[in-house]
C-alpha cells in the first residue's frame, strides 16, 4: 500500500477563475513538508517548510557543484496567512543578501549595503509565496512585494498559464501552471493536483541566473506522498 499523509484529506483541485487567480482547495498548514526537486542540468534542490506553534520557516537549498546556495525565511502564522519577518540568501555559508520586515518597514540589500523602505503590504520571497498560494486558495496577499534580498519587486497579479506534465517516479502527472508578475519579470509556478496540490514547478530569473526546479519527491509530516 502506498504511503500517504493525513495532512491533506483530498487532492487540491486547481482551477481557473474568471479573474485569472489561482484557486485551490485550501489545505491546513503542516508541521513539516519536504520537497525534493531536480534543477537545471540535474542539480538537486530541496525545499522544506516547518511549523512550530505560530512560527514557521521555509528553506530552499540548491547544490550547485562547488557552490552551495541556501535561501532561508521565516515569520509568524496567523490563520492561513504567512507573515514573514526575515529572508536570507546564503552562499557557501556566508550571507550574500538579506531582508528584514517590521510593520511598514523593509530593510534589505547585499551584505553591508542595506537600505530601508516603507511598504504597504507584506514582503515575501518566491519560495514562501509558493506555500502561501497553497494555504490561501491561491489568493495573493494585498499590496504584495517580492524580494530576493537585493531588491523589492511589486507583484502585479497572477494568471493561468495552461497545463503541462512532469515525470514523477516514472509516471506522467499533470501540473497546472500560473504566472506571477513581479516587476518587469515573471515567475512561474506549477501545482500538481495528483500530489495534493504542492508546488511541482518553480521557475524564475535572478539577474543573469535562471532557476528551473521540477518536483521529484514529496513528504508531509513524515509521510511520503504519491499520485
Q: Where do the PLM segments sit?
A:
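Sec/Tat signal peptide C-region and signal peptidase I cleavage site
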Residues: 22-26
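Acidic/charged, solvent-exposed loop-and-adjacent secondary-structure segments enriched in E/D, K/R, S/T
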Residues: 107-130
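Acidic, serine/threonine-rich low-complexity disordered tracts
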Residues: 27-103, 138-227
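Short alpha-helix boundary/capping motifs
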Residues: 1, 102-105, 111
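Beta-strand/loop-rich accessory regions of lumenal/periplasmic or secreted enzymes
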Residues: 129-137
Amino acid at each position: 500500500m502506498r504511503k500517504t499523509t493525513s495532512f491533506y484529506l483530498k487532492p487540491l483541485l486547481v482551477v481557473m477563475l474568471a479573474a485569472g487567480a489561482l484557486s485551490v482547495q485550501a489545505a491546513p498548514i503542516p508541521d513539516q513538508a519536504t520537497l525534493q526537486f531536480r534543477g537545471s542540468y540535474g542539480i538537486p534542490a530541496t525545499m522544506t517548510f516547518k511549523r512550530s506553534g505560530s512560527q514557521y520557516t521555509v528553506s530552499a537549498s540548491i547544490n550547485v557543484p562547488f557552490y552551495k546556495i541556501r535561501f532561508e525565511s521565516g515569520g509568524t502564522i496567523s490563520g492561513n496567512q504567512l507573515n514573514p519577518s526575515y529572508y536570507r540568501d546564503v552562499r557557501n555559508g556566508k550571507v550574500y543578501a538579506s531582508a528584514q520586515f517590521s510593520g511598514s518597514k523593509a530593510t534589505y540589500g547585499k551584505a553591508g549595503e542595506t537600505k530601508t523602505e516603507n511598504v504597504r503590504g507584506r514582503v515575501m520571497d518566491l519560495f514562501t509565496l509558493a506555500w502561501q498560494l497553497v494555504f490561501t486558495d491561491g489568493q495573493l496577499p494585498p499590496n504584495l512585494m517580492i524580494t530576493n534580498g537585493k531588491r523589492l519587486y511589486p507583484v502585479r497579479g497572477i494568471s493561468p498559464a495552461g497545463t503541462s506534465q512532469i515525470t514523477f517516479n516514472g509516471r506522467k502527472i499533470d501540473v497546472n501552471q500560473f504566472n506571477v508578475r513581479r516587476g518587469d519579470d515573471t515567475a512561474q509556478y506549477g501545482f500538481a493536483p495528483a500530489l495534493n496540490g504542492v508546488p511541482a514547478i518553480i521557475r524564475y530569473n535572478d539577474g543573469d541566473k535562471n532557476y528551473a526546479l521540477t518536483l521529484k519527491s514529496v513528504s508531509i509530516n513524515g509521510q511520503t506522498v504519491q499520485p
